[in-house]
Each structure stands twice: as C-alpha cells, then as structure tokens.
Amino acid sequence: MTTSDLPAFWTVIPAAGVGSRMRADRPKQYLDLAGRTVIERTLDCFLEHPMLRGLVVCLAEDDPYWPGLDCAASRHVQRAAGGVERADSVLSGLLRLLELGARADDWVLVHDAARPNLTRGDLDRLLEELAEDPVGGLLAVPARDTLKRSDRDGRVSETIDRSVVWLAYTPQMFRLGALHRALADALVAGVAITDEASAMEWAGYAPKLVEGRADNLKITTPEDLLRLQRSFPH
C-alpha cells in the first residue's frame, strides 16, 4: 500500500454556538485567553501537527468575529456553514471535507472550539491508539469523585460505581463515512445527539476510550475561563 492509499487525518471544529452560560458580549470561542481568542488557541494544536491533512471550522452564517482573525486567512483552514445543533454543524463540516477530497475511510477528529488546552501529547496518543482501530474513539478522563444519582426531588437514589464511568472529552475520532451515516441517521430518527461518540453508539458501535489529561477543559462558565488563563503565557 502506498502512502497515498493510507487513510488521511482531518479535523472539524464546530464553532457556531453562542455559549449563553458565559454571559458575555460575544460567543465564548471569541473571548480573550491570554492575548488571543479561545478559538485561535484551540486551532494551534491541530495546525502545528504534521499528520493532519486539513481543518474545517463550522461557523454561523452571520459570524462577525471570524474574518478578523489571522487564522481565517490560513490556507490550511477551510470554512463550512454551522447549523442549529452541534450535529448539524459537524455534518456540514464532513460534507466540506468530501469537497476537499477526503475519502469515506479517512479519519476525522472533531474537537470543541472552546476546548483550547489540548496538548500535543494527548493528540499524539489519540492518533496512535486509534489509527488501526476498527471503530475509533475519543479522549476521556476516568471519573475521580464519588458519583451520586438523584431522584426527582434532588435526593440521592444510589451511588454509582465510578470505576466504570468516564468523562467524555474531545477530540473524538471516527471514519468520515461511518460518522456521516451515524449522524445523519440519528437526526432523521430524532435521536438526541450530544457528541459524535453518542451517534456512533446509537449506530451500534463501541468507541474506544483513550485516557487524556483532565486539564483539557471545555470553557462553559466564566470560572472555566479564569482557570485556563493560568495555563497560557501572557
């Protein structure tokens, strides 16, 4: 098999969300993080990796912030239309990859736009562990705290065995064709899809969990942003 016959690796960044819980004047991916926007920090790890063929960012149609970023002019970054839900945006990104020459058996890494602290080590580990995997998988972190299930009155109904519980992170890495089918079929069926792994699970696959760093945080609240400010040099 020649190098050109091997599956390529691509990245999709869904970035059409508004992040209402941040209570900010702009979407959280455009907030400042040590002198640069969150999304620029997020893209760095992928744009610097030699194994990745290309990257697609899925943006809201009327996004006024993206055009002003240096990365918007990069030949390595392509744009796709974002959707109402994450799954819609990812599907749009996958279709854009096909237009760029990606194949159904190529790998796609989907990563949160507001998860800027991914390390090169975690990205390398994901690529190495999943490149030969029949399904694909995701970065995840084992649950470390005691977990409780509540009833409808907010009282503990049971304690959950944390040894079998993981927190799902990103990137999540799957074959382009399989992921496209899973997402499209789930949307048609009206299934609630929270991430790419949940679509693959619904389609009958068992994604592999690849342990990553706990500081690969997704910015959801103002407190998350403050925590991450300490991780980046000013």
From Swiss-Prot:
NCBIfam families: ispD
Site (Transition state stabilizer): 21, 28
Site feature Positions MEP for the nucleophilic attack, where: 162, 218
Name of the gene this protein is made from: ispD
Name of the protein this chain belongs to: 2-C-methyl-D-erythritol 4-phosphate cytidylyltransferase
Domain of life (superkingdom): Bacteria
Organism: Pseudomonas paraeruginosa (strain DSM 24068 / PA7)
Pathway: Isoprenoid biosynthesis; isopentenyl diphosphate biosynthesis via DXP pathway; isopentenyl diphosphate from 1-deoxy-D-xylulose 5-phosphate: step 2/6
Pfam families: IspD
Role, per record: Catalyzes the formation of 4-diphosphocytidyl-2-C-methyl-D-erythritol from CTP and 2-C-methyl-D-erythritol 4-phosphate (MEP).
Family, as annotated: Belongs to the IspD/TarI cytidylyltransferase family. IspD subfamily.
Alphabetic keyword roster: Isoprene biosynthesis, Nucleotidyltransferase, Transferase
